[in-house]
Amino acid sequence: ADVKYFFIHALHCKWINNFTTEDRNFNIVEKTDIHVILDIQKNFGFKKNIKQHYSKEFLKWRLANPRFNYRCFICYQGQNPVGYVICYEDEGKLFLLDYCSISVKVQKTLIRRLSQICIKSKLKGIITIAIPKSEEGKWLKKAGFLRNPFKKGPLTTNIPFMILTDQKPESQLCSKDQWQVTPICHDAL
């Protein structure tokens, strides 16, 4: 299973902002409170059978030593954090680095905020990566992300998902369902 690019084009960002209303039940705040992010991930993360795909120390290190200027948006319902996104700008695009939410409604609210940033900064769109049929890929599709269905053109590159292990190939480690492939864990992002 290869990792693929997902995207929302700038025109789609404008569509999202012009034809969807802001949900007043949610408040989105830009901050870097790592404890809130880890609590959201622990409570609402994609795969409950993965104990912890990164630690508080890893997240602190990653945000303290960025390759890019990371921005974190946390969505609250009342006083309760119910989702977050971490993103950065690169080469005229907004890259979604990490994400988690309690519901489709929350994820669409967060994507709407990213769409506003995309429009305000005159970016080409929002991009990220995931395995298409994984939980992450399904989340992105529900949030309005698309994939290029053609073999040529922009964002068609496959990013190989390779597992190097001394265990037999039929091991559960070799199943894509045992892995949570998110951009924050990719070395180059």
Q: Which functions belong to the PLM regions below?
A:
Residues A1-D98:
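Amide-forming acyltransferase catalytic core, primarily the GNAT-like/NAT-type
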Residues A1-E22, Q77, Y84, Y88-K108, ...:
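Active-site/acyl-donor-binding loops of N-acyltransferases
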